[in-house]
Amino acid sequence: KKLKPYLKHMVTGNEVPLDVFYQKDSALAPNMLLRRIPGYEETVERLVQELKLLIEGRRKEPLQIIEIGTRDAAITRQILNVLEDVSVAYTYVDSSKYFLQEAEKELAGYERVEFEMLNLEESMDKQQMALHSYDVVISVNALHRNIDAVDAVKKVAELLKPNGILLMTDLVVR
């Protein structure tokens, strides 16, 4: 029902579907639809709690953290709020320029966040990311977007320092 007013305009090319889903009617945004899945909010909260436990013993050492394409500013804010009193270098990456710009707008008040492009479907050699340099990689519902999720996880592992930690949650079909 919510999509019906936009369908004609999207099909005829007079409306950009991404704008409809992400700007015109936020109730249609995929991240809003995800919140309706039973257990989704609890899963995100669990990830945030794990991050809290991880940083408890490391407040003096600056942490290098990278978040991969969450595309949900509310979740990123939860994460950044946990890190408020922690020495951290935080990088938010996405494979889409559109979503990276949206994240920059949504998170403009967080000065410690850097924004970079990263496409896990391309060779890591051709991208600007420093390999083996992150203490923590955070991925919330992002890796399933890759054609080859196993290869994407291998590339994520290349970002981690030795003994680095991947905090990840993703939807799977059972």
Name each region found by the language model.
Residues 1-174:
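4′-phosphopantetheine-dependent carrier domains
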